Regions:
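Structured, active/binding-site neighborhoods that engage oxygen-rich ligands
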Residues: 1-304
Length: 304
């Protein structure tokens, strides 16, 4: 649920600078529709983007296969991509790497060859279900978080971002402190990309700065080495609701930053912290709750 509310909260501000958001919206404390002329124009308050859609596709592939199946996940992505030919709006603002990879799979290219060497956050933003399902075994979390990246993203940074998010979610579920979660997520990610891991670990040194200063130096583009550290900063620095408000108001890839932060808080604290005003308008709530429940039940059987 944290992924979806973060995504929907950050949806209308994606692509704006922090200054533009302040001028157009103020602090983003409630769900809002995408502005006219925005690339999410047409989405209403509470609707989510590709971040949540891909997270759900991964979660539902895990449920269908009673575990991770790269073939099954690739099939989910391909079926989703096929809907774009009927209605372009159904891609929900999908990123370039994922769009190109999915279109390649639709044309028959196997998932082992479809991914692009682009260091963006598309694999990280959807990785939370791996951490949820396999949270008692970090080796499996790391392996499968990396593997689920490959149909769309093959760069070291993109894969490291996915590992960091999935490991973070897993450790949130097992009750680690925020400091230990950050260190372990960076350590696991370092085996794929040292630079990414250094930037993630650096977040711990920025917690005494003003939030706008810290997020300004972390930056907030769709690069995994910016989006993922920004999300972890919000997780480390704030309580859940305020973390998502800050993520949605900070500029850049706001929906991904807020959704990743939401995934960490969802694992750590469940959904009790989510304002009812957010949940009341959230798209697909029944589908999201069903997937979360099924994953939790499946995890209980796998992790015994």
């Amino acid at each position: 649920m944290g992924v979806a509310v973060g995504d929907a909260l950050g949806m209308p501000t994606e692509g704006y600078t922090a200054r533009e958001i302040s001028s157009k919206f103020g602090m983003v404390r409630e769900m809002m529709p995408a502005p006219e002329g925005h690339f999410h124009s047409g989405l209403t308050a509470g609707q989510f983007t590709d971040d949540t859609e891909e997270t759900l596709l991964l979660a539902e592939s895990l449920i269908d296969a009673s575990g991770f199946s790269p073939d099954g996940f690739a099939e989910k992505l391909t079926s989703w991509g096929a809907t774009w030919t009927l209605d372009e709006r159904l891609n929900r603002g999908v990123g370039f790497a994922t769009r190109s990879a999915v279109e390649s799979m639709i044309r028959g290219k196997p998932w082992q060859q479809s991914g692009l060497n682009i260091p963006t956050c598309g694999a990280a933003m959807r990785a939370a279900p791996i951490g949820l399902l396999y949270h008692t075994n970090l080796n499996i979390v790391k392996s499968y978080a990396d593997l689920q990246s490959l149909p769309t993203h093959t760069s070291a940074a993109a894969r490291a971002g996915a590992v960091a998010v999935a490991v973070g979610v897993a450790l949130c579920l097992t009750g680690f402190s925020k400091e230990m979660i950050l260190r372990n997520a960076a350590s696991q990610a370092s085996r794929l990309d040292e630079y990414f891991a250094e930037r993630l670990l650096w977040v711990g040194e920025l917690l005494d700065l003003k939030p706008e200063d810290a997020l300004g130096v972390i930056r907030n583009s769709p690069l995994a080495a910016e989006t993922v550290p920004a999300a972890f900063y919000c997780f480390m620095r704030f309580e859940p609701e305020e973390a998502l408000v800050m993520a949605a108001s900070s500029g850049g890839d706001t929906d991904s930053i807020a959704s990743i932060a939401g995934s960490l808080f969802g694992a750590a604290k469940g959904s009790r912290w989510i304002p009812e005003s957010w949940l009341a308008v959230l798209e697909g709530r029944e589908r999201i709750e069903s997937a979360a429940l099924c994953l939790s039940e499946l995890s209980s059987s796998i992790c015994r």
